């Protein structure tokens, strides 16, 4: 079962990403190390597989 967008947002915030807003259902996150990510979708929607992969990849980049 796919995870929800709100779970991905929570995971990004725990990893140190800050939400800088966005238009509509888009959210722009940035880490202090300069890693950026745009996540789209309403919090209650299911996350697409590519979104889950992208979040994992960006969190790994921020930990290096």
Predicted regions and their residues:
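Basic nucleic-acid-binding interfaces
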Residues: 1-21, 31-64
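Minor-groove-contacting beta-hairpin "wing" of winged helix-turn-helix DNA-binding domains
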Residues: 26-30
